[in-house]
């Protein structure tokens, strides 16, 4: 509250002083979903046997040269858009594509690795936690992440030698299902961004649904967001 010598007072509530700066960026989620789907298509076809084992190095190159950089771009833009959960998820998958691609490129065709198996178990744990958090606002993402974690666990069991080739082939089936879901998700998110409303259902709820219900509803939580509050 400010006071002048003439005794007049006027209030300057914090919300009236809020300045909104619009960044010239678009959503990185459609790009992330489409590239994720193509990567899963490669992994699924490798596991089922539709891609010959002796072409493993080609698959690794595609994961590193195509999927990884696109996911990286999607991750950066998700952070710029202040979507912490989405950016964290994309970031974890970004480096996983580089890791898996590099492993395939550096290893003899068909070779398994206990180290890769343990990595997949750890990655699956993180993804399951993210899937649980996603149920609060984005159940479609939760289903996608749960399937991805299941695929990792099955592949991990094969890598450490605790399961046979059949389990690895089943993980390939999961990967193909993930590829289809990711393509649907990418199309839905792209249409949503173009129309500024939900066209294909993504079953948003809570704060995720409120993001399309008006500007005031989004400002209600602005003061507590990272980049506005004093500490992360």
Which residues fall in each region the model found?
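Alpha-helical transmembrane segments and their cytosolic membrane-interface
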Residues: 23-38, 80-118
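Structural signature of hydrophobic alpha-helical transmembrane segments
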Residues: 53-68, 110-123, 144-145, 173-176
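Helix-coil boundary and interhelical linker segments in multi-pass alpha-helical membrane proteins
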Residues: 48-54, 105-114, 160-169
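Helical transmembrane-bundle signal
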Residues: 36-43, 47, 67, 71-74, ...
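N-terminal topogenic module of multi-pass integral membrane proteins
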Residues: 1-72, 206-232
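Membrane-helix interface "capping/anchor" motifs
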Residues: 77-87, 132-143
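C-terminal transmembrane helix-loop-helix hairpin of multi-pass membrane proteins
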Residues: 24-29, 129, 136-232
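Extended, positively charged loop/linker patches that create polyanion-binding surfaces
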Residues: 108-114, 128-137
């Amino acid at each position: 509250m400010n006071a002048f010598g003439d005794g007049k007072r006027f209030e300057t509530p914090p919300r009236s002083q809020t300045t909104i700066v619009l960044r010239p960026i678009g959503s990185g989620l459609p790009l992330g979903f489409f590239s994720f789907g193509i990567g899963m298509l490669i992994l699924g076809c490798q596991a089922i046997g539709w891609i010959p084992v002796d072409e493993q190095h080609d698959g690794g190159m595609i994961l590193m040269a195509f999927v990884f950089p696109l996911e990286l771009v999607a991750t950066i833009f998700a952070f710029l858009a202040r979507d912490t959960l989405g950016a964290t998820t994309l970031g974890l998958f970004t480096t996983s594509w580089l890791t898996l691609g590099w492993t395939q490129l550096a290893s003899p065709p068909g070779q398994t690795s206990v180290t890769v198996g343990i990595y997949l178990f750890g990655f699956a744990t993180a993804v399951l936690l993210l899937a649980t958090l996603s149920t609060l606002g984005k159940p479609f993402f939760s289903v996608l992440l749960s399937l991805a974690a299941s695929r990792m666990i099955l592949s991990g069991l094969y890598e450490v030698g605790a399961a046979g080739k059949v389990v690895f082939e089943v993980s390939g089936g999961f990967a193909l299902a993930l590829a289809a879901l990711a393509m649907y998700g990418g199309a839905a998110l792209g249409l949503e961004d173009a129309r500024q409303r939900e066209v294909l259902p993504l079953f948003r709820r809570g704060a995720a649904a409120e993001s399309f219900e008006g500007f005031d509803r989004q400002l209600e939580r602005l003061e507590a967001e990272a980049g506005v509050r004093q500490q992360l």
